[in-house]
A protein has these predicted regions:
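Short, charged/polar low-complexity linear motifs in solvent-exposed/disordered segments
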Residues: 6, 11, 69, 78-79, ...
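RNase H-like DDE/DDD metal-dependent nuclease/strand-transfer catalytic core used by mobile genetic elements
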Residues: 38-46, 51-60, 72-78, 82-228, ...
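C-terminal domain-tail junction helix/linker
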Residues: 180-184, 206-275
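Basic, flexible linker segments flanking DNA-binding modules
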Residues: 1-91, 193, 249-258
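Residue-level detector of intrinsically disordered/flexible regions characterized by low predicted structural confidence
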Residues: 4-5, 30, 64, 197, ...
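Sparse recognition of residues in long alpha-helices and their boundaries
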Residues: 30, 45, 65, 141, ...
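Short secondary-structure junction motifs
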Residues: 24, 157-159, 238
Length: 275
């Protein structure tokens, strides 16, 4: 009976979390499970937990990253990369932005795309601005930026950098004007290497290929509703290996370097070079 109760509790927990985050991996599931059931009689160990995921076909296949949605073939002003030697030490030091696409299926079986613009705090990994638009027009990236800016309206922020690719949306006069008006320094990648905007690319992938995994949308309204739910879960409940398994909201209370659950060779190099 005790084993049966533990199995039932474990399966119900996985089902509940996966209803909010269909693509969350086994390690994060295990850590969330341990936090919730660690002192309960229904608690099972890590190996048993992984065996349950495998037996009941609850493991997740890795997905490929989405194609880029950047058009940098324009003649608007571009800006140097200010992040190459930057070490993150506090919130609102660096924001990163990017765009990804989401498929909408039409009744006749054809499909169109809508586009999700995200602004993320690079230190906390919190999504602080987002907008879903039916085109790649700059008005949607502007709306995401305005959401992020409202967060800092009552704060005294100095030296905040906004980093993006060189897409026309981020180089547009309206977008740059908002950055300038709020004392935010524009920074852009210097080539097409996704690693130059890696945090933004990673967050795109988490939202699209993990939190929205397996969802089939028939309207942009459905996408907007699902994205709002996904962002709330991502910010408030999903632990991050890059944040020592804190959530982004929890990381917002931190100062100084946050321990990662892997080796960051970039940060290791910069710490030595700047010592």
């Amino acid at each position: 009976p005790k084993k049966s109760a533990a199995l039932t509790a474990t399966l119900e927990f996985v089902k509940r979390v996966r209803s909010k985050d269909p693509g969350i991996g086994g390690m994060k599931l295990w850590l969330m499970y341990r936090n919730e059931f660690g002192t309960s009689q229904a608690f099972v160990g890590r190996d048993c937990f992984c065996a349950i995921l495998s037996k009941y076909k609850l493991t997740i296949r890795k997905r490929f990253r989405a194609p880029r949605t950047t058009d940098s073939s324009h003649h608007l002003p571009q800006y140097p990369d200010l992040t190459r030697t930057l070490l993150l030490e506090h919130p609102d030091q660096l924001w990163v932005s990017d765009i990804t696409y989401i498929t909408i299926w039409l009744p006749d079986g054809s499909y169109v795309f809508c586009y999700l613009s995200l602004v993320t705090d690079a230190y906390t990994k919190e999504i602080i601005g987002y907008c879903v638009g039916d085109t790649l027009g700059s008005c949607y990236t502007v709306e995401a930026l305005e959401m992020a800016v409202r967060r800092i309206a009552a704060k005294e922020i100095k030296g905040l950098i906004h980093h993006s690719d060189r897409g026309v949306q981020y180089a547009s006069a309206d977008y740059i004007a908002i950055l300038r008006h709020n004392g935010i320094l524009p920074s852009m990648t210097e080539d097409g290497n996704p690693k130059d905007n890696a945090i933004a690319e990673r967050v795109n992938g988490i939202i699209k290929n993990e939190l929205l995994q397996g969802m089939r949308f028939s309207s942009i309204q459905e996408v907007r509703k699902a994205v709002a739910t996904a962002v709330h879960f991502y910010n408030n409940e999903r632990p991050h290996m890059s944040l020592d398994m804190l959530t982004p909201v929890q990381a917002g209370e931190m100062q100084g370097p946050i321990r990662k659950r892997w080796i960051s060779y970039r940060e290791k190099y910069l710490n030595v070079a700047l010592a």
